[in-house]
Amino acid sequence: MISPENITGLILAGGRAQRMGGIDKGLISFHQKPLIESAINRLKNQVGPILINANRNITKYAGYGYPVVMDETPDFSGPLAGFSVGLKACKTSYLLTSPCDSPLLPLDLAARLAAEMERGPFDLVYASSLESGKTWAQPVFCLMRANLQDSLTAFLTKGDLKIDRWFKELKSSTVIFDDAQAFANVNTPEELKILEAAL
């Protein structure tokens, strides 16, 4: 059994947030608290150590008491850049990734992905959601083995940043969650208002 202590949680807060006007999404207020706080609170009982991947406002993020890791690639290169620095900093056997702007992320995310990982062997297991009879991949909600650093470095060296293409190079599986809203994220001011009103 994979224990929570053997999983490092990586909260991805390093994006450019163009659709939010370039505002740092992790620091946007959601019910009077920054989104990063919701991510920490929903993740902290599921994992051991926590890392925050951020590329600006480093001091503010560091104020939450967790190590902050910055992308090593320029120009906000996407979630794989965050995965890469997270894997390098990870001291446990597994890394669980989650974006900072999904304040309803499942409280059993780690447990369910870990159960599927043990059913493997798999390199990584990601979440999917069921909505209107369709299954939608949620690849940034992902549990991966910490030994994937070399694979990811080689992939990024080719100049590819597409998360689904890296997954195809690996032994992967998915876990389907019935509550699609659990993965709802905030990309625009309108989505923020809708999500706040739903709670």
Curated annotation (Swiss-Prot):
Where, subcellularly, is it found? Cytoplasm
Output the Gene Ontology terms for molecular function.
GTP binding; metal ion binding; molybdenum cofactor guanylyltransferase activity
* EC number per UniProt: 2.7.7.77
One CC-aspect GO term? cytoplasm
Cofactor(s) in the UniProt record? Mg(2+)
Family annotation (Gene3D superfamilies): Spore Coat Polysaccharide Biosynthesis Protein SpsA, Chain A
Q: Which superkingdom, per the lineage?
A: Bacteria
Residues that coordinate or bind Mg(2+): D101
SUPFAM superfamilies in the record, alphabetically? Answer: Nucleotide-diphospho-sugar transferases (SSF53448)
- Signal peptide start and end residues: none
What CDD domains has UniProt attached to this entry?
MobA
Residues where GTP binds? L12, A13, G14, K25, N53, D71, D101
**Keywords of the record:** Cytoplasm, GTP-binding, Magnesium, Metal-binding, Molybdenum cofactor biosynthesis, Nucleotide-binding, Transferase
Catalyzed reaction equations? Mo-molybdopterin + GTP + H(+) = Mo-molybdopterin guanine dinucleotide + diphosphate
The record's Gene Ontology biological-process terms are: bis(molybdopterin guanine dinucleotide)molybdenum biosynthetic process
InterPro entries (UniProt xref): MobA-like_NTP_Trfase (IPR025877), Molybde_CF_guanTrfase (IPR013482), Nucleotide-diphossugar_trans (IPR029044)
What main location does UniProt list? cytoplasm
As for what it does, the entry says: Transfers a GMP moiety from GTP to Mo-molybdopterin (Mo-MPT) cofactor (Moco or molybdenum cofactor) to form Mo-molybdopterin guanine dinucleotide (Mo-MGD) cofactor.
Whom does it interact with, and what assembly results?
Answer: Monomer.
Q: Identify its protein family.
A: Belongs to the MobA family.
Entry-linked PANTHER family: MOLYBDENUM COFACTOR GUANYLYLTRANSFERASE
* Domain text: The N-terminal domain determines nucleotide recognition and specific binding, while the C-terminal domain determines the specific binding to the target protein.
For this entry, the protein name equals: Molybdenum cofactor guanylyltransferase
Q: Can you name the source organism?
A: Polynucleobacter asymbioticus (strain DSM 18221 / CIP 109841 / QLW-P1DMWA-1) (Polynucleobacter necessarius subsp. asymbioticus)
